[in-house]
Amino acid sequence: SPGLKELMLLSLLTANHARELALLRGLPDPEEANLCGMFRNLGEVLVAAYFPRDYARILQVMEQRACGQAAAAFEVLGFPYEELGEAMARNWGMPDRVVAGIRSAGTQASDDLLAITAFAHELTTAVYRRDADPARDGVAEVLQRFAKRLKLGRDEVGGVLQSALKE
């Protein structure tokens, strides 16, 4: 499947970023953050693994229409990746907080774990995705959205990125 190996690596990086952020913020269970990060893009991974033609079409739509991943996935599949990820995580008996982390509310999340998961996912996307716009400072954009919510600065984010790569 196009990009499956990359998606698995992105899952690991998101998990590592989430755990590092949880440690930095003193959350009681950093491994729960790791698990939430690991499953954040479960729906996309499943589509790439089990429906490679559809996944290739999503990537094609993104390129042809210069649209975002969510819009392209919805156009091709008729539902967002997160719906599939949530359904499978529930089916597998994953904890409710892990399921909630798959479609977290980002900066609006009332739960620190969910905000950290959303930030970790967006950070990973901004830094490592091939389809990220190289002309934009994606890290600055993500940090601007989440800095107040998570009380983070650019230096702390740099430390999170370095620690996660060591892992």
Descriptions of predicted regions:
Residues 1-8, 12, 16-19, 23-32, ...:
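Metal-dependent nucleotide-binding catalytic modules
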